[in-house]
Amino acid sequence: MDFDYENAKFSMPEKRIFDSQGTLDFQNSVAMVRIQYHLQKYITLCKGQQIPDTIKESFFTNIVVELLKRLSALIDETPPERMHSRYGNLSYRDWQTKFQNQLENWLHELLPEKYNNSIIELSYYISNAFGSKERIDYGTGHELSFLAVIICLDMLKIETIKGPALLYCFNSYYDVIQKLILTYKLEPAGSHGVWGLDDHFHFSYILGATQLLDVNTSLIPKDISNTRLMEQNSSSNLFCKSIRFINVVKSGPFSNHSPLLYNISRSVHTWHKMQQGLIKMYKVEVLNKFPVVQHFWFGTAFFPWTSYGNNHSLPIYQPAENNDDADFLTANNATTKMPPPLSTSTSRFIHRR
């Protein structure tokens, strides 16, 4: 997919999704087409690949991995407060402040100088990829922002991205996120509780299932409840890494705390069907859910708020200011309510004929 950096006009990303109508318009945007295109591209690149132990130095990996190393070091420099609450250690906000204060300088240092114009947009997606400073939480919307970061770097054509490098970068990202969650007790953002796929992640499962396609592996979907196997394969596969993390943060039988994953693993018998179901679910439960995408903002270059059909600006259903009734929005029948919880049934995961 072509991206003309030389003629692109970058701007500070702004909120454009205020309600369910905005979510609907998002599905027909240039931004969504770019996300879907790169989603499929990265799935293809990671097919049958393992996470490498080391990676050859390159511009792309140096930018991503060095940034993640610095963020991990910031965690070490910002120990959590002693608190009795189960979630939300306030030291996370201190970490976020340090992160935000240094990010622009880091990007000027890490990015080739010719791409400096892109920093105004790139920095927003990086800032939003590591949880919410206000809510002290992390979820699939933040994970989506990191996917956007990778897409931005890809569109800049810094270099050709290959599957092992992509997996190495995502694995490094999930290492930092898991460290953040465990250190600062980040709450799940918009969690469906036991009715959701996972409190924090979704894209990691897609990449992990993709890694297991067209390879000689003894792993099968129902093995996800085997703690030992997930631990053994967590360093080479993102699906196993995600399951391992669930076992770290949750206790009790897997079927009790993660019934949707458990039921899927019992009804889906191949990694191909697992991958296809996860992609379908991602498009519905992440890319097309207002509580998730409302925090995905739009600039004028990487992810513009324009129609893919005619390249015209999409409408903005922004709440009216100074309205006596804050529940009414400028768009009719708009809603900002959290959708009902997912059923633990797998009927929304796979089509039965």
From Swiss-Prot:
InterPro entries: Phstyr_phstse_ac (IPR004327), PTPA_C_lid (IPR043170), PTPA_sf (IPR037218). Residues 343-353 have a biased composition (Polar residues). The keyword Cytoplasm applies. It is found in: Cytoplasm; Nucleus. GO terms for molecular function: peptidyl-prolyl cis-trans isomerase activity; protein tyrosine phosphatase activator activity. It is an enzyme of class 5 (isomerase). It catalyses: [protein]-peptidylproline (omega=180) = [protein]-peptidylproline (omega=0). One of its GO terms (cellular component) is nucleus. Coiled coil: none annotated. Gene3D superfamilies: 1.20.120.1150. Pfam families: PTPA. Its main location: cytoplasm. Keywords: Cytoplasm, Isomerase, Nucleus, Rotamase. Residues 331-353 are annotated as: Disordered. GO terms for biological process: mitotic spindle organization. The keyword Signal does not apply. Its EC number is 5.2.1.8. Belongs to the PTPA-type PPIase family. PPIases accelerate the folding of proteins. It catalyzes the cis-trans isomerization of proline imidic peptide bonds in oligopeptides. Acts as a regulatory subunit for PP2A-like phosphatases modulating their activity or substrate specificity, probably by inducing a conformational change in the catalytic subunit, a direct target of the PPIase. Can reactivate inactive phosphatase PP2A-phosphatase methylesterase complexes (PP2Ai) in presence of ATP and Mg(2+) by dissociating the inactive form from the complex. This is Serine/threonine-protein phosphatase 2A activator 1. It comes from Kluyveromyces lactis (strain ATCC 8585 / CBS 2359 / DSM 70799 / NBRC 1267 / NRRL Y-1140 / WM37) (Yeast).
